[in-house]
UniProtKB/Swiss-Prot annotation:
It is a multi-pass membrane protein. It comes from the Eukaryota. Keywords: Coiled coil, Membrane, Transmembrane, Transmembrane helix. Belongs to the LIMR family. One of its GO terms (cellular component) is plasmodesma. It is found in: Membrane. The chain crosses the membrane at residues 8-28, 44-64, 90-110, 128-148, 208-228, 332-352, 382-402, 422-442, 475-495. Signal peptide: none annotated. Residues 251-316 form a coiled coil. Its main location: membrane. This is LIMR family protein At3g08930. It holds the Pfam family LMBR1.
């Protein structure tokens, strides 16, 4: 099996290189033209953060493959050339936490700093915010680790009577080694009072990962629960509300005139808000108005794109309309596939996690059977389900960002994504990726058993003092399913309706 172990190491290195190249590809194709040939530090953070996020998701399938690298699934320490998965997990998530709480905020403060200031002043301003955050986080982590940084494992004290060795070593049916009356170990019938609590202090890296997981789990429950429903249903409703035919030139001119008027109103409002920002009047009303302008701007861009789809121009107008029709058809197909995956996810959570004892291994058994068909087929399906949860988080964040005032909108658009939106979404992905891994390690516990991820997330995290009850009573899983159900009902009731064009835009006074 040594050759297989070496192959696993080589595959891991190749995958890391592919992930790094993919991150650069996403940055180059999604970045805004205004950020071309500048903002190199934020771009480095984006590429590095995306790579860490994708690698962390792929590490769980790698952990499962690593477990099988030894003959008869012997634990990894019993053979050579396997990956040190526990050390890799801790390293990845410590880097993850540093990026989320320190590096990405610094890059965002630096990027969004006043361009009229010198480079030194922008760095100084960003450092002040980050150092303040670092001091607060260090104090909170230190106090919590010192006071409640322990794990409480429930164990059962077992005791059994012993039998004396026989004086004669001539065994037969009438003279066995153990007497006929010794049918079971007496500890098997131990009473409930024999249960004890074994307390020990966890390591600091594991504690940091645990707290980061809690923060990520809250966001994952909210955004993921909403996104698991709105991701496929959003694609399906886009197909339902698609333009059915090309409009006339007069209709196009009328709609374009209205959109131009709306654009001038938004520009005037944005200029006014910029003047207020310069004067230091950044109160609650200012933030509310900024949110309103962002929302209207996104709606305006969506209306412009829709108008261009309904009235294609140029020599290839017919071809453009054909691609528009095919694009909406692709959205419908992807929406149906996504809906099947979302239903499978929610059903698996209910069947395997919320019902005690589980009704069925469900997706665990599917992955195992796929592995029997071809070695990496189950692993690939496993990775796909994990990645789908991350996509659901992004979709949920976008939907809630458009509906709720206190959530900032950071859309990701091909060729039009500013670096602050890139950084925000990378931070969200990194923070939620920890929770996605923990969630998958729990949801697919039967398939991912005896892995390093289960040791960290399945035992230590769920026994950590102060937060173990969140996992004991499935708080996050229940919240996830409830939000998914509410979002589904929302789309059934309102999602199919066409959006009404808003009237004249005005700032709140």
């Amino acid at each position: 099996m040594g050759d297989f172990n070496l192959a696993l190491v080589i595959v891991a290195i190749v995958v890391c290189v592919i992930v790094f190249i993919s991150s650069i590809y996403l940055l180059v194709n999604y970045q805004h033209p205004d950020d071309a040939n500048q903002a190199y530090f934020p771009k480095f953070v984006v590429v590095f953060g995306l790579s860490i996020a994708m690698i962390s998701i792929l590490m769980l399938p790698a952990d499962v493959a690593n477990r099988h690298a030894c003959r008869h699934a012997i634990y990894n320490g019993a053979c050579n050339l396997t990956l040190p998965m526990k050390d890799l997990w801790l390293a990845i998530y410590i880097v993850d936490a540093i990026l989320v709480f320190f590096v990405i905020p610094f890059a965002m403060f630096f990027y969004e700093g006043d361009q009229d200031k010198t480079l030194g002043k922008r760095i100084k301003s960003a450092l002040i915010w980050v150092v303040t955050t670092a001091v607060v986080c260090a104090l909170v982590l230190g106090i919590l680790y010192g006071v409640i940084g322990k794990v409480d494992f429930s164990v059962r004290h077992l005791a059994s009577a012993t039998s004396t060795f026989p004086t004669s070593w001539q065994f037969s049916n009438t003279q066995p080694c153990i007497g006929n009356t010794a049918r079971q170990c007496s500890a098997f019938t131990a009473n409930p009072t024999s249960e004890k609590t074994w307390t020990m202090r966890t390591t600091f890296p594991e504690y940091v990962v645990a707290l980061a997981t809690i923060v990520g789990s809250v966001l994952f429950t909210i955004f993921g629960g909403v996104g698991i429903a709105c991701l496929p249903l959003g694609l399906i409703t886009a197909f339902i509300r698609r333009p059915k035919a090309v409009i006339t030139r007069s209709q196009y001119i009328k709609e374009a005139t209205e959109l131009g008027k709306k654009a001038r109103e938004l520009k005037k409002a944005a200029d006014g808000l910029h003047q207020e920002e310069r004067s230091g009047a950044k109160g609650r009303k200012w933030r509310k108005n900024v949110k309103a302008v962002e929302k209207e701007l996104l709606q305006l861009e969506e209306d412009v794109n829709l108008l261009e789809e309904m009235y294609p121009q140029g020599e290839q107008a017919e071809t453009a309309w054909a691609f528009t029709v095919l694009g909406y058809l692709a959205k419908f197909i992807l929406g149906i596939v996504g809906l099947i995956v979302s239903i499978a996810w929610v059903a698996h959570i209910i069947i395997y996690l919320l019902v005690d004892p589980p009704l069925s291994p469900f997706l665990n058994e599917v992955f195992i059977k796929l592995d029997d068909v071809w070695g990496l087929l189950g692993t690939a399906a496993f990775a796909f389900f994990c990645f789908y949860l991350l996509l659901a988080v992004i979709a949920g964040a976008m939907m809630l960002g458009l509906k709720l005032v206190f959530i900032t909108i950071h859309p990701m658009k091909w060729g039009a994504t500013l670096m602050n939106s890139f950084l925000f979404n990378v931070g969200l992905i990194l923070l939620c990726s920890i929770s996605v891994i923990q969630f998958c390690a729990t949801a697919f516990g039967y398939y991912a058993q005896a892995t390093a991820a289960q040791e960290i997330f399945g035992h230590t995290l769920q026994s950590l003092r102060g937060i173990k009850y969140l996992y004991k009573y499935n708080v996050f899983q229940i919240g996830f399913v409830i939000l998914a159900g509410l979002t589904f009902l929302y789309y059934i009731a309102f999602g199919w309706r066409r959006k009404k064009t808003s009237g004249r835009f005005q700032l709140s006074s």
